[in-house]
């Protein structure tokens, strides 16, 4: 694989070195994406990286927030709007405290990026039914007017994102409480037909996991129906992508990080139609995380032996950190993968020690696009 030294690239761009690069997502320029947005969950910064040159062409640190409203180093995900006018950063906040949403005005032609607004989320805890409101991931509706925000304690916020320059502020227009949307909030995908798909995961301890689909078609009218809730087999749903079968039907494919399963969900009937394990002789404990699909190839980040986030309590020398490339069947109900379909990211120069004393690679992949 091509390797980019982010510390050097940041220095070359007059940006501070990143800590814990986490989620990487592209913008929506045509005919193809021009930039990716990299959220650094240990340093509170978002890097804007030119895809062709691989250079960091902008960096925005959201620690402290706009006009001191608030913001920590925990910038979990930075997502571009479909019209490319803004990006919203989900800032988890400090441990046991509520987080923030930051708005960055974006211009990918001039590489001009500036923080214009911060929204504190502690004011929504009562409606959510949670002690804190910690945003995890989000996605915009196709018209770039609303963002659906998942939360660590369950529940979901729908935000009218306002204007790109911040003169019209972000406003929460719908609160789904934790009983309506249970589970640790995770990834969000925009589906056809004005729908948004999210996950509700059980985390490292296991428990109930869900896939949700939200009808956004009447959001501009202030109508927000309750989501369709689909219970998932396995433990700790995380990555989710979609697949179109030979008949044109759409399926959700979800990776279960703790139990190493992949679920196939018929989104016409809202039923799980197949579950398949990723565990194999060449990857006994893969720990599949964030996923992306191109054609019939599903790319999944596989976590490391000593995870840096979320499942840090689950150590194992049987991990194979890297990227798995699954070939999805034409009917979107199964996958195949072989040892040659694993792009290893093991790094023998950087080792860590597990609780059992074994020495393993420090590599711990997470986001991919």
Region spans (language model):
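Predominantly soluble domains enriched in secretory-pathway, periplasmic, or organellar proteins
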Residues: 1-369
């Amino acid at each position: 694989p091509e390797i980019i030294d982010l510390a050097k690239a940041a220095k070359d761009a007059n940006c501070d070195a990143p800590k814990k690069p986490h989620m990487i997502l592209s913008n929506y320029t045509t005919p193809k994406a021009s930039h990716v947005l990299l959220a650094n969950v240990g340093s509170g910064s978002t890097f804007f990286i030119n895809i062709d040159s691989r250079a960091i062409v902008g960096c925005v640190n959201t620690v402290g927030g706009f006009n001191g409203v608030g913001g920590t180093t925990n910038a979990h995900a930075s997502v571009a709007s479909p019209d490319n006018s803004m990006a919203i950063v989900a800032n988890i906040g400090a441990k046991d405290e509520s987080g923030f949403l930051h708005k960055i005005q974006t211009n990918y032609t001039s590489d001009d990026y500036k923080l214009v607004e911060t929204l504190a989320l502690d004011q929504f805890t009562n409606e959510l039914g949670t002690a804190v409101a910690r945003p995890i991931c989000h996605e915009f509706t196709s018209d770039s007017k609303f963002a659906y925000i998942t939360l660590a304690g369950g529940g979901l916020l729908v935000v009218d994102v306002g204007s790109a320059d911040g003169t019209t502020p972000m406003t929460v227009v719908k609160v789904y409480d934790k009983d309506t949307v249970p589970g640790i909030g995770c990834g969000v995908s925009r589906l056809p037909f004005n729908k948004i798909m999210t996950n509700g995961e059980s985390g490292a301890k296991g428990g109930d996991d869900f896939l949700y689909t939200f009808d956004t078609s009447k959001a501009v009218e202030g109508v927000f129906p309750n989501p369709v809730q689909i219970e998932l087999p396995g433990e700790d749903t995380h990555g989710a992508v979609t697949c179109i079968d030979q008949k044109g039907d759409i399926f959700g494919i979800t990776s279960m990080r703790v139990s190493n399963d992949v679920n196939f969900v018929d989104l016409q009937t809202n039923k799980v139609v197949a579950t398949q394990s990723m565990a194999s002789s060449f990857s006994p404990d893969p720990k599949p995380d964030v996923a992306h699909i191109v054609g019939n190839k599903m790319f999944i980040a596989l976590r490391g032996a000593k995870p840096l986030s979320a499942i840090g309590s689950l150590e194992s020398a049987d991990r194979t950190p890297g990227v798995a490339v699954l070939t999805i069947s034409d009917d979107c109900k199964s996958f195949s993968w072989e040892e040659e379909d694993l792009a290893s990211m093991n790094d023998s120069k950087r080792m860590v020690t597990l609780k059992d004393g074994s020495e393993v690679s420090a590599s711990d992949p997470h986001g991919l696009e």
